[in-house]
């Protein structure tokens, strides 16, 4: 049963990121086909910003509700339904016939993803109460998130190459539609194994005894939890800001490089997919590094700074220099940027269950992850695109790369400064 638990959590984490990271890959061709919107035009910028930010707002609001429901209805039930929601939404998006329809389905996908992370982390943390085992399980199952990123890069590259051999959708063989359809995969095994998944024993016991307290958003801001809530929310935003404000703009930056801009569109898509895959390999390495170090380093502040200190120096440089002029060097740089940034996502999955009590765990995690990460953090994508309009540079891609460098410096420096206020968990065991 423990392997089944870890398998479901790993599947959920993998396709959580899979569904999110397909957007930067599918967006340019989807906007072109559904709305006749060309890359580099003001209309493209408007729809790109809408596709990034509107789902983030919806995911943040409904994800917060999902965290509350995780505390009220149980971890397993909310986890399963959140995975089914994002899987079927992504599959339906493959058949979108207009940009508003695609936007609506991206919103429901984002809601499922936002709820899944919170429910899965609380569920796993409570199923494995031994501190060292819990750290390893959370660390290594979350590493599958980066496997999801690798999968979507690989799948998109394959579909861009071999899509013509697949059945046509609306009379065409578009890689972006097939990529969205592949998001259905996690729903299939989950429907079969759902009855065999256990509920969190601690939550179930409290519920049966009638001693489970009612969760409350207001409680997050009482003196006992106020500092934890504010600092973790802002730091989660910084972690997501680095990913969405810089790294996830690569599909728009890479086609502007001298070695790429002269290639036919299918070959450009293959190069973009390759660069994304290198970045995800870096992220996977970072998640495994975090999983190993989480057991070895006692201080949570010290653990996080292992990734923040080099990141504040290196990540802005990657976007300021290689991203504007050298594809080969960019691949090396983006591997490091992915490692340092994505490792921080796993950190929060390990840290947050240790600072909130059982009745408030889902709500507290959800506030940091969804208000901080999904709403504030992902809005860095919008900040970057707006800043790009004021940047120097001969092409839109170069201006976007410089803006990404500036945003990366801002969020990394802010996160490092905030780490000095991050509360250390009082003990190894989860608070009751």
Where are these regions (language model features)?
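Transmembrane-helix signature of 12-pass secondary carriers
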Residues: 1-432
């Amino acid at each position: 049963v423990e392997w089944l638990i870890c398998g479901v959590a790993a599947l959920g984490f993998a396709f959580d990121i899979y569904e999110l990271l397909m957007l930067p890959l599918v967006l340019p061709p989807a906007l072109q086909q559904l709305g006749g919107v060309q890359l580099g035009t003001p209309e493209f910028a408007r729809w790109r910003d809408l596709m990034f930010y509107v789902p983030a707002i919806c995911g943040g609001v409904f994800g917060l509700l999902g965290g509350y429901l995780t505390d009220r209805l149980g971890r397993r039930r909310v986890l399963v339904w959140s995975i089914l929601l994002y899987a079927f939404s992504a599959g339906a998006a493959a058949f979108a016939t207009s940009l508003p329809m695609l936007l609506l389905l991206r919103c429901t996908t984002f809601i499922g993803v936002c709820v899944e992370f919170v429910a899965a982390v609380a569920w796993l943390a409570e199923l494995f109460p031994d501190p060292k085992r819990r750290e390893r399980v959370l660390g290594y199952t979350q590493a599958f998130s980066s496997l999801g990123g690798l999968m979507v890069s690989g799948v998109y590259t394959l579909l861009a190459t071999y899509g013509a051999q697949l059945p046509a959708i609306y009379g065409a063989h578009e890689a972006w539609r097939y990529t969205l359809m592949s998001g259905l995969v996690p729903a299939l095994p989950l429907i079969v194994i759902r009855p065999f998944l256990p509920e969190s024993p601690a939550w179930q016991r409290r519920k049966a005894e009638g001693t489970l307290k009612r969760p409350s958003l207001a409680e997050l801001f009482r003196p006992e939890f106020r500092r934890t809530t504010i600092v973790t929310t802002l730091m989660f935003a910084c972690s997501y800001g680095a990913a969405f404000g810089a790294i996830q703009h690569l599909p728009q930056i890479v086609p502007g490089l001298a070695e790429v801009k002269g290639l036919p569109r299918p070959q450009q898509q293959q190069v973009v997919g390759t660069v994304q895959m290198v970045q995800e390999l870096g992220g996977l390495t970072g998640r495994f590094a975090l999983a190993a170090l989480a057991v070895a380093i006692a201080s949570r502040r010290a653990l996080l700074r292992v990734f923040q200190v080099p990141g504040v120096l290196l990540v802005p440089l990657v976007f300021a220099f290689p991203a504007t002029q050298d594809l080969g060097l960019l691949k090396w740089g983006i591997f490091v940027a992915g490692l340092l940034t994505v490792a921080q996502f796993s950190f929060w999955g390990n840290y947050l269950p240790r600072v909130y009590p059982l009745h408030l765990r889902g709500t507290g995690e959800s506030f940091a992850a969804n208000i901080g990460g999904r709403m504030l953090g992902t809005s860095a994508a919008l900040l970057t695109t707006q800043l790009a309009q004021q940047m120097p540079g001969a092409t839109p891609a170069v201006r976007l790369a410089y803006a990404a460098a500036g945003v990366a410096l801002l969020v990394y420096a802010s996160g490092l400064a905030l780490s000095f206020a991050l509360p250390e968990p009082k003990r190894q065991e989860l608070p009751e």
